[in-house]
Amino acid sequence: MGEFWIKGPKAFELVQKLTTNDVAALIDGKVQYSCFPNDKGGIVDDLLVYRFSAEKYLLVVNAANIEKDWAWCTKWAKELGMNVDTDLENASDNICQLAVQGPLALKAMQKLTTANVVDMEYYTFQEIPFAGIDKVIFSTTGYTGAGGCEIYAYVKDAEKLWHAVFEAGAEFGIKPAGLGARDTLRLEAGFCLYGHEIDDDHSPIEAGLGWITKFVPGNDFINRAYHEKLKADKPTRYMKPFELQDKGIARQGYVIEDAEGNEIGVVCSGTVSPWTGKSIGTGYVKSGFHKLDTEIFIRVRNKALKAKIVKTPFF
C-alpha cells in the first residue's frame, strides 16, 4: 500500500477537498473509507483516511497508484498554499502493512500486545507496542469482508512482524494468502477494486459508492457539483453484482447483453466463489437493467450465458 502523511493547520482542509466522504465526521482514532474524485467525473483512487488529530492524517492508497496519487495530493496542497516539503510526506517506502483477516484475527493478535485490541470497534486504530516492536499502527480494517486487522510498521521491522504474527496465529490455523486470494475475498464481499469497478472514467455515484460521497454543508470536495447533479438526474449506468445461471466464468471486459443480444454493459470482475461454488461477478449495466433479479447475459466467446442481478455480499 501507499502511505501519505498530511500535517499542519491546513491538513483538514486539504483532506476534505481531496476526498468525497465527510472528514468533519471523523474523530481521533477513527478510520474512514473514501475516494479521490478527479476533475472529469471519475475517481483517481479509493483510500482509507486515518485521523490522528485535526492537524495530522494518514492516507492509505493503492500501491499501484502511489505515483499518480502523490502527484494529485501535492497539486492540490499547493493550490491551498501548503508547503509540500513539510506538510506532506510520502512514507510509502518506509512503511509496510500486514493484513491479518478472519473472525479469530483479533483474538490471535491479542497475544502480541498488552493493549486491548480484541475489543476494538470496526474502523478504529491505535498506536501500540506490538510483537516486541515499540510502536505500530493497529487498525481494525480489511479488504476481505471477514473482519480482522491491518498492522502498519516500519519496513525494518517487517520480517520480525511476519514471524511473530504467524507464531501467534499457529494455534488458530493461520495461513499466508496472496493477492489472488484477497481479490476473490473482496469480490465475494462486494468491495470495489481500482482498475475494475472504479477508475478515472466512472463516478462514485455510478459505482455504488454514494454512501461515501457526502453532499453535506462544508464538504466542498473536488468536482462536487458534477456528482451532485449526477445523483439528482440519475446515472445512465450502474455498477451491479451478478450471478451466472449458466455454467461459465465472467471475466473483465466481457460484454453484457440483454435477451435480444443488444450490448448493455461490460464486466468489471468475475470468478467462481469458493464460498458458494457459484460463478459471480460485477459489471456496469445501462439504467433499467440494474434492478434486483433483472435477467442479463454475459457474452463468453460465442455463447450468451444467462445471469441475474443480485445483492452483495455474495456469501
What are the roles of these predicted feature ranges?
Residues F52-F315:
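Conserved, structured C-terminal
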